[in-house]
């Protein structure tokens, strides 16, 4: 098979893995030094970093052959799809060629399981090692780690990759047993623990070799089973707490041609995936717990965002006096983000906050109005019941512009 044909197959096969954001890696550059590449965003941009940089990654599988038969996966053993396999040398060549053409800033590399977990992990490491040592490539590298691989291989991968990740796959162990019986939650979490241990050791010892400086992430498939959002968020919360993950990515299940009856024939609403990302951001950045966002079983509402849903369910905290409230509570007001909350706190050291200041800070006034008090404003909507406010603030369908 020609290299271009392999690329067509294995780039398409990698599209279902969404955990490829190049985030948190220290900036490195070969400018003025020996070597090749940089982690600075340039060229065609596809992924966004937390500081706003855009980076383009070559996102491929080493192979889509796989020993496992996960029911939700397009590359499962029983799937009738075109198969291909790169050699490590071919991936190195592609990465360097794309970089020299200014098409990418880094590499995201995953793989189906071939021969064994250790053999597959060795092949992935071989790519990263050659890029770093033989070609002095200083761009971003994200490697998928293989559950059940030897911890020594995980440690070696961390020396060459900016980020490592291992997919938790599904929100519950029972779903994993039913849909991917060849995988075990224990081995997945053991790999997460190995990565976390490597990060901890690298931070504790100044002279320790670098180890995945952008941390680790994971991916959870949404809608392949009946798990509700409350369980999903509690699972994510546990992963953040136990293994200090940088990100949990949520991927709405995509129906696969000729898929088994054990998985749905319809995809979940993409808006559900979006709401989970919003809720996840509130847990990571705003101090919300999963129990606050969903106090019981069920899914996040689709018509309003999770922050607004929390505010409507906790009206006793509102309206908030912006001239007196704690910064953490100001950040929980719908329509006011972390940065705006910090600016408001800084501003009130100089003067009393007025409603026009919210406009200047570009807060979302429609959302914020029912929940804030300023020197010259007190909401008339504050006494309205939550159901009425929800109806007014819900994100209803909008007519698309014709041009």
Put a short name on every predicted segment.
Residues 347-348:
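Residue-level signature of tetratricopeptide-repeat
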Residues 57, 70, 109, 166, ...:
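Conserved, mostly hydrophobic/aromatic
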Residues 94-110, 279:
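Short Fe-S-cluster ligation motifs
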Residues 60-89:
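Canonical Radical SAM [4Fe-4S] cluster-binding loop centered on the CxxxCxxC motif
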Residues 300-329, 355-403:
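C-terminal extensions
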Residues 1-65, 372-373, 380-394, 400-403:
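Flexible, acidic/Gly-rich N-terminal and inter-domain linker regions that tether
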């Amino acid at each position: 098979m020609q290299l271009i044909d392999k690329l067509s197959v294995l780039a398409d096969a990698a599209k279902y893995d969404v955990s490829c954001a190049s985030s948190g890696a220290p900036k490195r550059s070969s400018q003025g030094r020996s070597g090749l590449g940089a982690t600075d965003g340039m060229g065609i941009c596809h992924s966004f970093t937390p500081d706003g940089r855009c980076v383009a990654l070559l996102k491929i599988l080493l192979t889509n052959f796989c020993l496992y038969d996960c029911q939700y996966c397009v590359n499962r053993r029983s799937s009738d799809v075109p198969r291909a396999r790169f050699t490590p040398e071919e991936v190195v060549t592609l990465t360097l060629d794309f970089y020299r053409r200014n098409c990418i800033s880094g590499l995201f590399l995953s793989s189906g399981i071939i021969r064994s977990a250790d053999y597959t992990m060795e092949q992935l490491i071989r790519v990263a090692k050659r890029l770093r040592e033989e070609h002095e490539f200083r761009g971003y590298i994200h490697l998928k780690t293989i559950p059940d691989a030897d911890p020594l291989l995980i440690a070696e991968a961390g020396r060459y990759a900016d980020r490592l990740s291992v997919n938790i796959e599904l929100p519950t162990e029972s779903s994993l047993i039913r849909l991917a019986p060849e995988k075990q939650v224990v081995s997945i979490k053991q790999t997460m623990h190995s990565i976390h241990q490597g990060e901890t050791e690298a931070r504790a010892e100044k002279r320790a070799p670098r180890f995945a400086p952008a941390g680790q992430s994971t991916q959870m498939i949404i809608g392949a089973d009946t798990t509700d959002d409350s369980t999903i968020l509690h699972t994510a919360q546990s992963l953040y707490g136990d293994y200090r993950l940088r990100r949990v990515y949520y991927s709405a299940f995509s129906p696969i041609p000729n898929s088994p009856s054990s998985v749905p024939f319809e995809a979940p609403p993409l808006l559900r995936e979006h709401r989970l990302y919003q809720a996840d951001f509130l847990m990571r950045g705003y101090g919300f717990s999963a129990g606050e966002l969903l106090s019981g079983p069920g899914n996040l509402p689709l018509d309003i965002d999770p922050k607004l849903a929390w505010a409507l369910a906790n009206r006793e905290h509102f309206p908030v006096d912006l001239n007196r409230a704690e910064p953490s509570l100001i950040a929980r007001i719908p329509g006011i983000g972390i940065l705006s909350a910090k600016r408001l706190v800084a501003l009130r050291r100089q003067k009393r906050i007025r409603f026009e200041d919210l406009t200047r800070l570009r807060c979302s006034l429609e959302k914020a109005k029912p929940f804030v008090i300023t020197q010259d404003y007190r909401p008339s909507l504050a006494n309205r019941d939550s159901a009425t406010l929800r109806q007014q603030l819900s994100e209803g369908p909008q007519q698309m512009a014709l041009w």
